[in-house]
Every structure is written in structure tokens, then in C-alpha cells.
Amino acid sequence: AGFPTAVKLDAHFEDGGYILVNASECEPGLKHNIQQIEEEPEKVIRGVKLCMEISGADKAIIAIKKKNRKAVEILDECLKDEPNITRHLLPDIYPMGEERAVVRECLGIELEPSQLPSAAKSIVINSETCSRVAEAVDERKPSFLKHLTVRGKLNGGHDAHVFMDVPVGTSVGALIERAGGIDGEYGEIVMGGAFTGKSTTLDAPITKTTGAILVSMPFMDLHGASMGILVCACGGNYERMQELCKKYNAKEVSHCYCKQAQEMPNGSRKCERPGNCPGQVSNNLQFKKDKCEYIIIGNCSDCSNTVMASGPKMGLKVIHQTDHIMRAVDHPLYRTLRVS
């Protein structure tokens, strides 16, 4: 997230290419991208056309989850006279918004972890970014505003609060107060999504890449129970998972990486095939061998499903890194696979 749009659009496709618009709103519980498509579809589509013109792309595909029926209907109406812009329906699983997953779902091309979308003659751009491109060209407006979702353990309930055009630099605390304030005790405040966000503070400023502010339920106290950590490229890194282990008052005794979490030269990890799991039995066996009572996992929808296929049978108690947030936003926990 945050890669400069100007650099992306400097592709100069000579024989045509694709603008792939990521409207998946990949992280669970977020609503601002879909709300903008419902309210300002023309601005988003105008931005898509400008991105096509700048890059030389001759086609565009808007990738959106099929569960968002109202937004899909609005897009279909707006695109009926746009032969070069189509939409593609995505399943409601995480991480359908990962850029290589978008390429795979829209074009049927499986990219290696080290490859960029340009290897598939495509550029992946978020739907909000498309609208900002339209503002920059048509209104000569610099990019200093952000759409985001505030949600969680707030006064007034767990429904999403969508704030549009929030100035970058606004504090986390100010936005939480606009959403009603925190309801009593809570676990942590996360800036970003439940999977890839980081813990933050009330005085921290939002940035151009902030998509959400989430207030979690309090953490369970595991009273020093032994815990294994399963790190997935689609979720929190090892340091984030260690932080959560401590917040649950557990003792780390083992950690493993999903075998698809390929380490990149910069030390980060990317999933070999995002959203498609190879199975997690070997990691669960290691956790069992290391005498873990609990395991905390940061896996995608499919990988979480495979963890659950064997982990509980081995006596392992499974916690997902998003549990404390999913409970706060009234979202199903990531365990067995649900696809819509």
C-alpha cells in the first residue's frame, strides 16, 4: 500500500494493457470504498479513464466482491455504454484485494511473489485512488484527503462509521470521538485493517494510506499459557504476532511460517498463491511437538480453514489474530471457510 500512483501509471503500454481497479475492500468490516462507489461512481469511472489514457491501457476491469449487490448494480448501470471498462465479481474471502490475487482473478495469470502486475501488462489501482486522479486532473486538487472507516467497541454500537475526505494528519482520537467515543474498556486501537493494521495511539495522525481505525474488544487473559505463533504473509508479521501473544498474556514457545510465505530481499514476506492454501498439518504437528496449548494464526480465509481441519483434533486451541477485532465489529471469526 502507498506505492506512488505516478510511478505506476508511467508504464506506457505500447500494445495495450489493463487498468485493474481494486474495489474489493479486502479487509473485513470496512465500508468506505463501497460507499464511494455507491455515491460517486462517475468520479471513480472518470479516474479509471484518465488512468487508461495516461498509461496507454486499452482495457479496464473493476474488481468488486459480489456480496456488494447495490454497488455492483450501480456500476453495471454506469458501465453499460463503456465497452472498454468491465467489472469482475470476487468471492468474499481474504485476501482477494492483494494485487496478485486481483491479477489472477481478473486475468487468469498467476504471478510469482517477486513479480509486479506489469508482468501481466496490468496496473492495479485502488478505487479511491482513481477518484483522486480525477480530482487532480479535473479540479487541480492535491491529494491531502482520505476516506476511511472507524468501527469497533464504540458508544452507539458496532456499525461502521464512514468518514469521507478527512484531512491527512487528523488524529486517531478525534475520529474516534466523531464516531461516538470508545465504549468502556477495550483491548487496542488498530490503524489499518484487522489483518495488516498496526496498533496505534489516540494522538497518532492518519496518513494517505490509512484505511481504518478499529477499536477492539479486551484481550482474554491466558495466564501464561504456552502459545505457538503461525505467521502468514497475508496477516501480521512476526513482530505483530509476538505483540498479540503478549497482549493475551501467553508465553511464546514456538513459531512457524506458512510454507507459502516467501521471504523477499527486503525481509518482508509475500504469499506464493494468495488465498489458496497448501495445508497446515506440518505446522500444527510442530506446535503439538513443542507442547503448545494455544496457537495464534494470522492466516487468510483458506489457510485458517486448513489450520482448523487438523489443529483442534490435535488438542490445539486456535486464536486468530483478528478475533478481538472481529468480535468488536460483529463479524464472523476466521475459522472454517465461508465463501459467498
Question: Residue locations for each model-derived region?
Answer:
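Iron-sulfur-cluster electron-transfer modules
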Residues: 1-105, 221, 228, 233-262, ...
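Short boundary motifs at domain starts and secondary-structure transition points
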Residues: 8-12, 113, 138-140, 217-223
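Short, glycine-/Ser/Thr-/acidic-enriched flexible segments
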Residues: 25-26, 92-94, 155, 171, ...
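Hydrophobic alpha-helical positions that pack around
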Residues: 61-172, 178-185, 193
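Ubiquitin system architectures
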Residues: 181-227, 232-233, 243
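N-terminal glycine-rich "phosphate-gripper" loop used for MgATP/nucleotide binding
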Residues: 296-305
